[in-house]
Structure formats: C-alpha cells, structure tokens
Amino acid sequence: MDSNFIFGIGAFTAIVLVLAVVILIAKSKLVDSGDITISINNDPEKAITLPAGGKLLGALASKGIFVSSACGGGGSCGQCKVKVKSGGGEILPTELSHISKKEAKEGWRLSCQVNVKSSMDVELPEEVFGVKKWECTVISNDNKATFIKELKLAIPEGEEVPFRAGGYIQIEAEPHTVNYKDFDIPEEYHEDWDKFNLWRYVSKVDEHIIRAYSMASYPEEKGIIMLNVRIATPPPRNPDVPPGQMSSYIWSLKPGDKVTISGPFGEFFAKDTDAEMVFIGGGAGMAPMRSHIFDQLKRLHSKRKISFWYGARSKREMFYVEDFDQLQAENDNFTWHVALSDPLPEDNWDGYTGFIHNVLYENYLKNHEAPEDCEYYMCGPPVMNAAVINMLESLGVEHENILLDDFGG
C-alpha cells in the first residue's frame, strides 16, 4: 500500500479526532446539560437541584419560587432583581438599564436574563418565599369605562392571598387567540370602539405569558381579587402595532373561566405615619388608589387627612363614584375630587376641568401651608405621572414623599 495513502488516511483520522474533541469541549462549555444546584440564601434547606438550561427566573419558578416580574421575563421592567454570588456569568447589556454600576459590583442581576448553565449561589428577598400560585375562578368581568374592565376573581375555598393594600399579583395565560369582535361591551361604550374600528383586532399568542396587575381590592375583601384592566389597543396613529397580549386575554374572560395567579408582590405600600395623604390617579391607576383608600378608611379607620384627585376624559370614564361618595359622607377626614379633561356636552359637567396635576395645584396645593410635608401616592398614565412629579418637585416635595405605582396606568 502506498505510504502516502496511509499517511493521508492517518492525517485525516487525526484531524477528525481533534475536531471531535474540540466539539465535545465546546459542547461542555456552551450547551446546558446535566443537573445543577442553586444554593439560596446560604440555607441548605432552600437549595434546589434541576437540569441546566433556561433562565434563572424560570428555574426558580419551576421549583415554586416566584420572583416578581411585571413584564413576564422580558427584561423591560427590572423587577426580578436578585443577587448572584457565583455561577451567573458576566452581566449582559440588556440588564444595564436597570442595574447601576454599584449594584453590578455587588452581584445584582435580572433573573430573567441569567442563563442557568452551572451551579450557582444566589440571594433572594425573604418575602419571595411567601409567594404562592392559585387557580382562581372568574366571578365577573364588567366594563367600568370605555377601555377598562373590572375583573373579579374568586380564590379557592379555604385559601387567602395575604396581600397588603397597594400590592399586585401576576396573572398567567397559555397560548391563545382572542377576537375583539367577540368582546361583550355595553352599548354606552361603543362610540370609541366604532370610531376606531377596534372590533377588527385579533390577539394571537403562541407562548405562555405572565403580566403584573395592581389589585383594586383591599385586604378585608376576603375571598376575592379585583383588578382594573385597561385594554392596550393599538394607537390610532399606528394601527399595525399588535394589541396588548395579556389585556386582550383578560378582556375575553367570562364568568366560570379559570385563571392562574401568583403573589402577593409589592412595594407601593402606605407609610406608617400621621402625615397627610394625597392620592392622585387616572385611568386604570384607580386600582391601587381604591385599595389604599378603602384600607385606610374601612380597615384601619385612619384619622389622617386624606384626599383623592382623579383625572378622566368624561363622565363615561368615571367609576366607583358611589363608593367614594359614601366614603366621603362617612369620613370627615376624606375628600375626593374628579377633573374631566374632555367633558361631553351631555355630561352637563360643572366640576373641575383640565388635567389633574393642574387642578390639584390650582385648587389645593398652591395655597397649602406645607405641601412638602404631605405624602403623595400616585398611579396613572405615564404622562400624568411625569406631570405630577414635576409639579411636586417644584413645590419642594422630597422624592421620599412621592410614591409611584408604575403598573396601573
């Protein structure tokens, strides 16, 4: 046999073997395989073992440890921060908009962005271990305004969600398709739906999704969870944008349907002081406002001075009016005020008009003896939130007295 031929075969075989070794080494480095252990809070009893792969947020959830994630793991909300002491790899560019350089040095990461490739050591907030999942049943799902529904859920009998006023839950949905033409919307709200032909939209979701919603219920309303959900329709100027996935799903729910929630979560809690409380809301930002105000007056029987300032377009967008009227009649320390930015002729409105931050300033804070001493709790559309914050800062209110819920608007 020709020696050159034998040499060629040998060289080819050697190259194949070298390539095979390189591939195996690369696979061991790049491809998740085998079981790994995640040590948690230096507590051996909290450690979990599971197959490598996926993200840390999902890995923890698979073992019943639910870290808050308002965006459902998309990396946009920054809620799912945990401290990764080892095994998490380098911080990713997608995390840097939510994590400061100081936090990064301390090991803080977004758990939805951390790949689970090897064993790791993490530190989680203790309240995470009180979070649970429930399969709830839809009691009702009624329009309260043109684009807002009140979803009322029954918690399984014998269970309770131990939440605080101002807290939120996460709601889950499996892949689904929602046709807007099937929505049950009262005739009084059809004008805008017809004007923009919103009935034509379809929301098709091909994956499991999770979103966060602030609760409108307060802790004494036992056995139920109540949400105010604004449907995220495509903006009129950009009608090709897909409609909101979770809001479309929630709007399609009917009494008797089953819904999975997890919680409770939250940090938008009332301070335990005697300071005056000023609540400012708009749109679906009503939810945490209702929760807080009902809790203060109905459960705690607070004697703090409390006022609520709510902005809406027209009377059609006002809701819970009778509830707040009754609270005002029963509590000398509580007043509430509505400003309509675009009242309809048929509204015959003789109350405040304009944007709520201007109305609050002109009719109350401008002549307040010490606006900087009040506590301000707000939830509404981003434009409203920004306008209110700018107004409060101009009055000398410190950031620690401005509490904002970003979810409800």
Swiss-Prot record:
SUPFAM superfamilies per UniProt: 2Fe-2S ferredoxin-like (SSF54292), Ferredoxin reductase-like, C-terminal NADP-linked domain (SSF52343), Riboflavin synthase domain-like (SSF63380)
Domain called FAD-binding FR-type: residue spans: 131-271
Membrane-topology descriptor: Single-pass membrane protein
One example of a Gene Ontology biological process annotation: sodium ion transport
Cofactor(s) required for function per UniProt: [2Fe-2S] cluster; FAD
Domain 2Fe-2S ferredoxin-type: 34-128
GO MF, one example: electron transfer activity
Keywords attached to this entry: 2Fe-2S, Cell inner membrane, Cell membrane, FAD, Flavoprotein, Ion transport, Iron, Iron-sulfur, Membrane, Metal-binding, NAD, Sodium, Sodium transport, Translocase, Transmembrane, Transmembrane helix, Transport, Ubiquinone
Enzyme class: translocase
Protein EC: 7.2.1.1
InterPro entries: 2Fe-2S_ferredoxin-like_sf, 2Fe-2S_ferredoxin-type, Beta-grasp_dom_sf, Cbr1-like_FAD-bd_dom, FAD-bd_FR_type, FNR_nucleotide-bd, NqrF, OxRdtase_FAD/NAD-bd
Reactions the enzyme catalyzes: a ubiquinone + n Na(+)(in) + NADH + H(+) = a ubiquinol + n Na(+)(out) + NAD(+)
Binding site for [2Fe-2S] cluster: C71, C77, C80, C112
Localization per record: Cell inner membrane
Transmembrane segments: 5-25
GO cellular component: plasma membrane
Domain of life: Bacteria
Cofactor note: Binds 1 [2Fe-2S] cluster.
Keyword Membrane: yes
Assembly description: Composed of six subunits; NqrA, NqrB, NqrC, NqrD, NqrE and NqrF.
Family of this protein: Belongs to the NqrF family.
Protein's job: NQR complex catalyzes the reduction of ubiquinone-1 to ubiquinol by two successive reactions, coupled with the transport of Na(+) ions from the cytoplasm to the periplasm. The first step is catalyzed by NqrF, which accepts electrons from NADH and reduces ubiquinone-1 to ubisemiquinone by a one-electron transfer pathway.
Protein name, entry field: Na(+)-translocating NADH-quinone reductase subunit F
Organism: Mannheimia succiniciproducens (strain KCTC 0769BP / MBEL55E)
Lineage: Bacteria, Pseudomonadati, Pseudomonadota, Gammaproteobacteria, Pasteurellales
